[in-house]
Amino acid sequence: MPETEHETCSKEWLQSQLRSLDSKDLILLDCRGSHEYSESHIRGAVNLCIPSIVLRRLAVGKIDLASTIKSPELKQRIQSGYKLCWFILYNGEGVPGQNQEIAGAGSLAVAMDSIISILHRRLKQDGCRVVALQDGFNNFRQAFPEWCEDDNQTHSKEIESSRNVQTDQLMGLRSLRISTTQSDSACSSSAESSDCESSSHHHHHHSHHNYNEAPVEIIPGLLFLGNATHSCDSEALKKYNIKYVLNVTPDLPNKFKESGDIKYLQIPITDHYSQDLAIHFPDAIQFIEEARSASSVVLVHCLAGVSRSVTVTLAYLMHTRGLSLNDAFAMVRDRKPDVSPNFHFMQQLLSFESQLRLRPGSRFSCSCIAPDCNCMQTTGFMATHLANATGVSPDSGIEFDRWTPSDTGLK
């Protein structure tokens, strides 16, 4: 076993450890993209495909590694043996340098903006035992293919896992603000819902009081973001010519539905870990497009107007304007600084972004702000997606305090 001051391990050492009785003390983190991981990975490894906006928080110590783990079993392993287990980090091609001594924080012999370097530095700072696979996955697979799982094996395991509780994916975020300060009546009626938008709503009410006084116009003449109060404010709805209301809650009433003056779409989603908001993206996008075609305005709201409604708005911007998740988030936050999406909804958006990139003709180039621009047309991809809507179930409803898009080039 490598000494604690060593940064890297060889493929031979890793294979010997996988064969040993102590393999349960190894935690393998695959730092490649999710697509590469799904094709093949080292047996027992979990994929750590972290959005750059989250990676930065991990780098500066605002969240810990356990906070990004979705699997309860793996999270328990990390928490109980954080400084006892060996963390093995690997990418596709490997890292340069052999067994270099760590002279101080940030001395890992890989690019400083890589996931591996950030993880290595952070784990070392926490006193953990961590090495990077010098040879990389590609060389390891060539030497020891029997210790790798291919796409079919992974897919079979995912199907089996989905029959029970979906706990085999990475990317869960534990609460950074777990206590709620509003009454229970303000939260979702779901007994299992953590629905911490109520906590966030209270927090931002004090920190950014003016953000909640009126719905916020995200796309001029088309889309406003708001909260429960705004959805019941008839004067505000009239003032902004809002004729469509997208209600992203399971239990808030559609107050003016019976009048017939406003068209509603309700997406019954809480912030609980079991919720799949992505599966509703097609309907939500179609509803907003309908409002645009009718030269009307839509209000997208949830309880606090900072998480679920923001997620839907981001999906719309990504699909119709071809924005990346980072760019869409920056655009929305520039107009509404108190946005605070649920971590797992952000992960669903990351998957949605990947879907958009994989479909020819699904990406756009939009620099305008007009709601009737030609670049906001539904494509063939959307038609297919509407017919076969799928999504990734999240595993947390705990509110994330603040998202910050990357400006350092971290990917």
UniProtKB/Swiss-Prot annotation:
Domain called Rhodanese: residue spans: 22-149
Record organism: Drosophila melanogaster (Fruit fly)
Regulation: Activity abolished by tyrosine phosphatase inhibitor sodium vanadate. Activated by rl.
Active site positions: C302
Protein name: Dual specificity protein phosphatase Mpk3
Protein location: Cytoplasm
MF terms in GO: MAP kinase tyrosine phosphatase activity; MAP kinase tyrosine/serine/threonine phosphatase activity; protein serine/threonine phosphatase activity; protein tyrosine/threonine phosphatase activity
Keywords linked to the UniProt accession: Cytoplasm, Hydrolase, Protein phosphatase
Family assignment from sequence similarity: Belongs to the protein-tyrosine phosphatase family. Non-receptor class dual specificity subfamily.
UniProt-listed Enzyme Commission number(s): 3.1.3.16, 3.1.3.48
Tissue specificity remark: Ubiquitous expression in eye and wing imaginal disks. Enriched in ovary.
Transmembrane segments: none
Domain Tyrosine-protein phosphatase positions: 214-358
Gene that this sequence comes from: Mkp3
EC supergroup of this enzyme: hydrolase
Inactivation phenotype: Homozygous embryonic lethal, while hypomorphic alleles (reduction in gene dosage) lead to extra photoreceptor cells in the eye, ectopic veins in wings and severe defects in oogenesis in females. Females with the germ line mutation lay only a small number of eggs. The laid eggs are abnormal, approximately 77% of the laid eggs are shorter and some display severe defects in chorion formation. These embryos could not escape the embryonic stage and progress beyond the two-nuclei stage. Null mutants are viable and fertile exhibiting a mild, but significant increase in wing vein material.
Compositional bias (Low complexity): 184-197
Mutation effect (C302A): Loss of activity
Domain of life the protein comes from: Eukaryota
Renumbered residue ranges of the record's region Disordered: 184-209
Main localization (coarse): cytoplasm
SMART domains (UniProt xref): DSPc (SM00195), RHOD (SM00450)
Reaction catalyzed: O-phospho-L-tyrosyl-[protein] + H2O = L-tyrosyl-[protein] + phosphate; O-phospho-L-seryl-[protein] + H2O = L-seryl-[protein] + phosphate; O-phospho-L-threonyl-[protein] + H2O = L-threonyl-[protein] + phosphate
GO CC terms: cytoplasm; cytosol
Subunit organization: Interacts (via N-terminal region) with phosphorylated rl.
Gene3D superfamilies assigned: Protein tyrosine phosphatase superfamily, Rhodanese-like domain
